[in-house]
Amino acid sequence: MAERTFAIIKPDATRRNLEGPILSVIQQNGLRVVAMKKMRLTREQAEGFYHVHKERPFFASLTDFMTSGPIVAMVLEGDNAVARWRELMGATNPENAAEGTIRRQFAEGLEANSVHGSDAAETAAFEMGYFFNAMEITG
């Protein structure tokens, strides 16, 4: 059964015009983009999106980074979309990411790791709703 997940192409990747190569990986691996928008997050939007990390020591640098340039927010759909997207992204730390994963290919570092993905279906539901309303998601 088709599942949906949320994905972001982060500012380090948009700065290097990697949207196309990353979208190719997504589409070549059985996921469909059913919603997409390019935008620049405000401080408030970034802090709201990453609110679960508010007490963590990296919160300020993460929100600074995520507001440093445009992002591409997406809803992806396909069989086991959450797990499949996480597999395609690779480990959070690109040094630990498997060969052929997006982070191994494109990431600049731990924070500037090119992409974000929901870690569970419940998280995906919140994250999709944060960026898209139901009318913006096709499928």
Curated annotation (Swiss-Prot):
Transmembrane intervals: none
Entries under Pfam families matching the protein: NDK
SMART domains referenced in this protein's UniProt entry, alphabetically: NDK
EC numbers for this chain: 2.7.4.6
Cofactor(s) annotated in UniProt: Mg(2+)
PROSITE patterns for the chain: NDPK_LIKE
GO cellular component terms, A-Z: cytoplasm
The keyword Glycoprotein belongs to this UniProt entry's keyword annotation: no
Active site: H116
Annotated compartments: Cytoplasm
Keywords of the record: ATP-binding, Cytoplasm, Kinase, Magnesium, Metal-binding, Nucleotide metabolism, Nucleotide-binding, Phosphoprotein, Transferase
CDD domains, alphabetized: NDPk_I
Domain of life: Bacteria
BP terms from Gene Ontology: CTP biosynthetic process; GTP biosynthetic process; UTP biosynthetic process
Annotated NCBIfam families: PRK00668.1
Record note on quaternary structure: Homotetramer.
Family, per entry: Belongs to the NDK family.
Name assigned to this protein: Nucleoside diphosphate kinase
Organism: Oleidesulfovibrio alaskensis (strain ATCC BAA-1058 / DSM 17464 / G20)
Higher taxonomy: Bacteria, Pseudomonadati, Thermodesulfobacteriota, Desulfovibrionia, Desulfovibrionales
